[in-house]
């Protein structure tokens, strides 16, 4: 027998009508506009920006800018603008999932990121003694980029999303999910750090010794990344609703475009400097992306390409 509290057919119809006619909240309207913006400019964001970024960073490092354009060399506003644009697909993708719990997790992870980076730049632990050699925007205490979370969080979150897609149901096992994500984070840093050293973003004190045997990066750096990746993966795993994240991944085709940008930007820089192991890892990440069938739109759909054709 039906429960007395169960809604009648008329009540269900009224609720459905109310849902259909409900005015979207301001947040929902902003989210919808951001989704539309990213979809309209996918090729520009995921391909053009990292290509321009790679050329610009190499030109800065090698002194290729003429005097009239020297203001662009390592220009922090230029760098941060490019990074922010390339992050838009990820920001739009996770935006609907940021609730109070996720916000707390991100806040705590931000504190950790600043703290461990300060310890790293002042003591050499856990990444090895290093320093930023160009200002990546405003610096905290003169040693840490204020924009550090914008650089750090996406490395981990992209690895987390790629793991969920590639492993499928196997990612439901916590140990498998966390171990695979940490491994994916290490893979991205095996690409990032040699490229960043090549374009002189930062430098390790061991650069002139055998202990910096991986393209100017000490192997101890990666032990430090195991620690930070584990902390960050746990924060995302606990802070984000995984069921909602999987659903968003299914409906949001551009959610991993930031990883596409990463592969093009840092894979390209490493290729220009002949860092072939990082290039091979970047290619492997690209193959992983292709197997997820996430980047299959027609180039002609890009707003930039349509504008050029006019």
Language-model regions, residue ranges each:
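Central hydrophobic cores of alpha-helical transmembrane segments in multi-pass inner-membrane proteins
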Residues: 27, 78-93
């Amino acid at each position: 027998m039906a429960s007395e509290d169960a809604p009648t057919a008329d009540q269900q119809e009224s609720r459905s009508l109310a849902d259909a006619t409900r005015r979207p909240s301001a947040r929902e309207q902003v989210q919808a506009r951001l989704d539309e913006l990213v979809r309209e400019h996918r090729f520009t964001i995921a391909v053009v920006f990292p290509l321009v970024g790679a050329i610009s960073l190499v030109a800065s490092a090698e002194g290729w800018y003429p005097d009239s354009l020297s203001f662009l060399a390592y220009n922090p506003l230029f760098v941060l603008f490019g990074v922010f644009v390339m992050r838009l697909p990820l920001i739009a993708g996770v935006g609907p999932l940021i609730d109070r719990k996720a916000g707390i997790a991100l806040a705590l992870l931000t504190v950790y990121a600043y703290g461990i980076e300060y310890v790293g730049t002042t003591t050499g632990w856990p990444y090895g003694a290093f320093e930023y050699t160009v200002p990546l925007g405003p610096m905290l205490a003169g040693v840490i980029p204020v924009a550090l979370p914008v650089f750090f969080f996406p490395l981990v979150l992209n690895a987390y999303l790629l793991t969920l897609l590639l492993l499928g149901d196997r990612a439901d096992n916590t140990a498998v999910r966390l171990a695979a994500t940490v491994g994916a984070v290490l893979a991205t840093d095996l690409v990032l750090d040699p490229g960043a050293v090549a374009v002189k973003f930062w430098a390790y004190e061991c650069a002139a010794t055998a202990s910096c045997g991986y393209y100017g990066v000490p192997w101890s750096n990666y032990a430090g990344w195991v620690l930070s990746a584990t902390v960050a993966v746990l924060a995302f795993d606990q802070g984000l609703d995984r069921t909602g994240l999987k659903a968003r991944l299914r409906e949001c085709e551009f959610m991993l475009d930031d990883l596409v940008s990463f592969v093009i930007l840092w894979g390209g820089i490493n290729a220009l400097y002949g860092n072939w192991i990082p290039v091979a890892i970047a290619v492997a990440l690209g193959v992983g992306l292709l197997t997820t069938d996430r980047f299959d739109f027609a180039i002609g759909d890009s707003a930039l390409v349509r504008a050029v054709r006019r």
